[in-house]
Amino acid sequence: GDKLEDEIFNATHILLSIPPDSAGDPIFKQYGDIIVRSKNLKWLGYLSTTGVYGDHKGNWVNEKTKVNPTTVRGKRRVLAEKQWLSLAKDHRAPVNIFRLAGIYGQGRGPFSKILAGAAKRIIKENQVFSRIHVEDIAQVLLASVNRPGVGQIYNVCDDLPAPPEDLSLIHISEPTRP
């Protein structure tokens, strides 16, 4: 095999964040069989999205809520999740799925989007989104690495859903400028 295949085969921990395509996760397709044969793998994390749940009209969801994606992106994430979870089910691979809410933190806040020309206003009555800070994501991943599961799914979000027009996170999303 090539060098990347050798690295994957010998890896103890793998974190996957590549967006899936219409066939699911490209890493699963290309390297899933190598990952299954690995004797060293202690933990595999797949970063997904809470978008797999679809629109629940402001109602709360949890890891047991049935997925019902309404976007192409969400449907592709569900397919990728199923691919990775099949390794956990069929081979007891230490796969963990992390469904991330809207990410905020340095370089990811509203000002960054405005400066990049990518800002969007989404204002719908009673529409709320969960969010998660980048540092909190890192803490969740580290906790999982230290206590790996098999086929676990985690919603990674704060417990403070807010409307998208809520700008209260700006002060912690962007550095103070002189």
Predicted regions and their residues:
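Residue-level detector of conserved catalytic or cofactor/ligand-binding positions
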Residues: 168-178
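Glycine-rich Rossmann NAD(P)(H)-binding loop
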Residues: 123-127, 154-162
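Glycine-rich "substrate-gating" loop/helix at the edge of Rossmann-like oxidoreductase active sites
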Residues: 69-74, 101-103, 124-132
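Catalytic helix-loop patch of NAD(P)-dependent Rossmann-fold dehydrogenases
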Residues: 57-97, 122
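Conserved Rossmann-fold NAD(P)-dependent oxidoreductase catalytic core, especially the SDR/UDP-sugar
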Residues: 32-72
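NAD(P)-cofactor binding segment of oxidoreductase domains
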Residues: 7-46, 82
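Glycine/proline-rich active-site loop of Rossmann-fold NAD(P)-dependent oxidoreductases
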Residues: 78, 91-93, 103-117, 135, ...
